[in-house]
Structure formats: C-alpha cells, structure tokens
C-alpha cells in the first residue's frame, strides 16, 4: 500500500507548495491536498500548473483533493453552488493529475428522515456528481463519519449506498478512526471488494462506546487503542493496494510546525505499513 499524507493534519500551519517538499523529504510518495490550503495558495498568486510541476519535481503524486461537503439534502440554491464548486474541483484535479475527490454527505437532514431515505438521497446525489466527475476522469470517495450530525455514520451504511449507486467511479473512503469510533469490526471488510475502496485514512482512536469518541481524540498510529494492524491487514485482504493516508486531528498535533508533523506522521506510519505488508 502507498504511504500518503493528508494535509488536514497541518491545516493550521501548512502551506503549498512547501508541504509537498516536506512530504518528499519524509518519504511520502503521495499527498492529499486540502481544498482550503489549495485556494489560499491560488489567491496568493500560485497556479495549478506550477503546483503540478512541484509535485512532479518532488516525485509526489496528488492522491486526492478534499473535500466536497454536504453533497446530499441540498436546497436548490445550495445544489447550484455545489455543481459550480464541483466542476471547478474536478477541473483542478485534472490539471494536478489527481484522479480522486473525497465527498461527505450532509450534516443537515430533516428530522425524522428514515435510513432508507438517507440512502436514496445520498445515492441520487452521488449519481449526479458521478456524471460530472467522469468527464474529468475523477473518482468520488464517500467518507462515512462517526460523529454527531453525520447522515452517513457507519461502514455498513456507506457500503449500502455504494451498492445502490453501483458506479465504477464512486467508492469508499475508509477512515480507521471513524471505522473504530462507530463500532465497526475488521471482519466486516470481508464483504468489500478492493475496487470499491478508493482511499484509506489512518489515525488511532481511544477505546470508547460506539459514537462517543471525540474527533479531537484522533492520535498518531500506535498512540491509541484501535487494532490498526489487524484492520489494515483486513483492508489489504480485499485487494486494496492504494494510499494509506495519515490524518490526525489531535489539537496538539494541529499546533505543530508542518515539518514536525509530517516527519512524525512518517515515523509512525512507516513501521505500521511494514508490519502489515510482511
């Protein structure tokens, strides 16, 4: 599997194109670009073409652009804004040589909406985005999130939505923190095809009852209680051989200088992947 770094981990102190050089120095071959950081770079006078050149010079590929948020249960005006933003993001992906975009379902669902209705609405929204993304050669990776308000909270729910969509360019983003925090188990992955899994985020999680962990309790691999080695072995058994991207939301980590955080991410992730791939 591919060693990848997620810019969310340095969202406070990171910057482009500097993060890319730091990732290369630490041994990462891929990076997930954060939309907000990318926009800040462009507003400061940078260009997509120059950023792609930096990626190529540093031998780091853009594995994903993150994220399109609240893609479901949109108002008419919100839907129009989402279409405009998604078209820009997909076009940016093409320039950057990036073939994947993270998508997140809505956190604002009408009270009393059934699980079946959430599945159908989310699937319909993904189908519309899928058509637009396909024109740019972009895949959509739906992330389930085991946090309050999320309309897609579990691995099983996400898998059901993907079965409903059934498109080659729509798959899953599996975050080990959300997987464990939502009470999912490694054996559940046996039903998942590797080609349905587009991205894996890795961070550690404390032992908590399902849906009670706080997002700030997202730690470096090996500093929590999640069975990360077992979980990543189960991921690998599906046939997945793509990016394993370090994303840590601990406020102490977010406060670190970008270089320190990127080096620490490599130090904790490299041994874990080595054990998984023995």
Question: Where on the chain are the PLM-derived regions?
Answer:
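Histidine-acidic metal/acid-base catalytic patches
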Residues: 1-4, 9-29, 52, 97, ...
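Transmembrane beta-strand segments of Gram-negative outer membrane beta-barrel proteins
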Residues: 1-3, 60-63
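Active-site-proximal loop/turn and secondary-structure-junction residues that shape catalytic pockets
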Residues: 9-11, 35-37, 68-71, 105-109, ...
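Active-site acidic/histidine proton-transfer and metal-coordination neighborhood
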Residues: 14-17, 54-57, 74-171, 181, ...
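Conserved beta-strand positions in the central sheet of alpha/beta enzyme cores
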Residues: 32, 64-66, 102, 141, ...
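Short glycine-enriched, charge-decorated loop/helix-capping segments at active-site entrances
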Residues: 40, 77-79, 116-117, 215-221
